[in-house]
Curated annotation (Swiss-Prot):
InterPro entries: Globin-like_sf, Phycobilisome_asu/bsu, Phycobilisome_asu/bsu_sf, Phycocyanin_a. Heterodimer of an alpha and a beta subunit, which further assembles into trimers and the trimers into hexamers. The basic functional unit of phycobiliproteins is a ring-shaped hexamer formed from two back-to-back trimers contacting via the alpha chain subunits. The trimers are composed of alpha/beta subunit heterodimers arranged around a three-fold axis of symmetry. The phycoerythrins also contain a gamma subunit which is located in the center of the hexamer. GO terms for cellular component: chloroplast thylakoid membrane; phycobilisome. Contains one covalently linked phycocyanobilin chromophore. (2R,3E)-phycocyanobilin binds at C84. It is a peripheral membrane protein. CDD domains: PC-PEC_alpha (cd14770). Transmembrane segments: none annotated. Belongs to the phycobiliprotein family. Light-harvesting photosynthetic bile pigment-protein from the phycobiliprotein complex (phycobilisome, PBS). Phycocyanin is the major phycobiliprotein in the PBS rod. One of its GO terms (biological process) is photosynthesis. This is C-phycocyanin alpha chain.
Amino acid sequence: MKTPITEAIASADSQGRFLSNGELQAINGRYQRAAASLGAARSLTNNAQRLITGAAQSVYTKFPYVTQMPGPTYASSAIGKAKCARDIGYYLRMVTYCLVVGATGPMDEYLVAGLEEINRSFELSPSWYVEALQYIKGSHGLSGQIGNEANVYLDYAINTLS
């Protein structure tokens, strides 16, 4: 999995050299942001159920047909609602994984690669998940550097789905 740190090391190693001052500064910057990133990951994890439930409700409010249409891809039944919450939780987990590693690698490798095909195969609308992630971004209650770190990866997921 690529992170700014592993990329700097791979570049230096492939050239048979030590890390440059610029690379060391970039790595140091990552370590300085790491505490905020871990704080954001911890908070999102601790509040996951509340955020997922609220995000699902936001989807149902914005797209009421989701709860009215029958079928396995809609939330008209308890099973459908559970699937919706599960999927929102998956996106939120990916955001927390990105926060831990300090890069979009987890999302790129585990989510983005097959996202379009999955959504098309299961007739899932990306706009549902955009709404859910926007809700989470607006409701996570994080501020300062911790909030900024969380929002970087929430925005990345939103932009990927848009």
